[in-house]
Structures are given as structure tokens and as C-alpha cells.
């Protein structure tokens, strides 16, 4: 959060803490609305912080423990005891037309080969994939059963 947007360090620290605790889209929207009401238009770097917090919350609900990019691949590491519909794995992989694969192991992961254009906006691509995972793997748990509470 830039100093030009929120000048008071204590307020900035409290906002960062609240952003890090975002658990769902409603909480995300509440903080966005509050920031606009209190401080005006939200700068890009603060929106990125908010977007990453929401992605992390959504990934947690899908039992994703890590999202990372390496050598043209966007990787989604799953909690090894994830309570997912395993029948949805094949559907998810097929929906990406040969660009996604699932690797079973101590840390199962989905690996998506990105095209040249997709590499320019990794955050948005990760958001789309997590949304697809949420739908196709048909989560059979509540938020209370997510990764944070299993670790």
C-alpha cells in the first residue's frame, strides 16, 4: 500500500492485516468498498495485493497449497489429503486441451503449459484455473475443512 494512498503507518498495517485475512469474495468486496470510501481510487499495487489475497483464499478452499510459475508452466500443488472428487481430475485436465497434466506424488500437482500471451498476466490465469478447479473438482467440504485447518 503506497504512502501516497494511506499516509498513516498504523492504518496501513491494520489494512494489510485485514487484507491478509480475506477468506472469500464478500470480504474482498467489503475491503475494496471501504478503501474507495476512505481513500479514493485504489492504486494498482494495492489492487494486486487484494487480488493475491483473494486468490490465496480461493486456492485454500480448493486444497491448493502453492501456486508457482517455472519455465512456461503454471503449477498448482495440492494438499496430499485433499478431499476432492477424483473423477473431476480427468475432466479438468481435458478442459485444457492437452495443455494441463496431473502429476500424482507426495505433493500432487496440476501443471498448465502457458502460451506466450498468457505469461503476461499470471495472476489472472491462476484465478481462472482455480475457479475451474473449484467447479470441476466439486469440493465436498466446507471452508472450515480447508488446508489451513488440516495443517
Predicted regions and their residues:
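Accessory helical-bundle/CTD segments and flexible terminal tails appended to RecA-like ATPase motors
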Residues: 1-151
Amino acid at each position: 500500500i503506497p504512502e501516497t494512498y494511506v499516509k498513516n503507518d498504523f492504518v496501513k498495517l491494520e489494512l494489510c492485516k485485514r487484507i491478509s485475512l480475506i477468506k472469500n469474495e464478500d470480504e474482498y468486496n467489503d475491503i475494496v468498498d471501504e478503501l474507495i470510501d476512505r481513500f479514493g481510487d485504489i492504486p494498482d499495487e494495492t489492487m494486486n495485493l487484494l487480488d493475491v489475497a483473494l486468490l490465496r483464499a480461493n486456492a485454500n478452499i480448493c486444497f491448493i497449497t502453492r501456486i508457482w510459475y517455472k519455465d512456461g508452466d503454471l503449477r498448482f500443488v495440492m494438499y496430499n489429503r485433499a478431499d476432492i472428487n477424483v473423477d473431476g481430475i480427468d475432466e479438468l485436465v481435458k478442459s485444457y486441451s492437452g495443455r494441463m497434466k496431473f502429476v500424482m506424488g507426495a505433493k500432487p500437482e496440476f501443471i498448465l503449459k502457458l502460451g506466450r500471451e498468457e505469461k503476461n498476466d499470471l495472476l489472472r490465469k491462476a484465478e481462472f484455473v482455480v475457479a475451474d478447479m473449484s467447479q470441476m473438482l466439486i469440493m465436498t467440504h466446507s471452508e472450515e475443512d480447508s488446508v489451513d485447518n488440516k495443517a
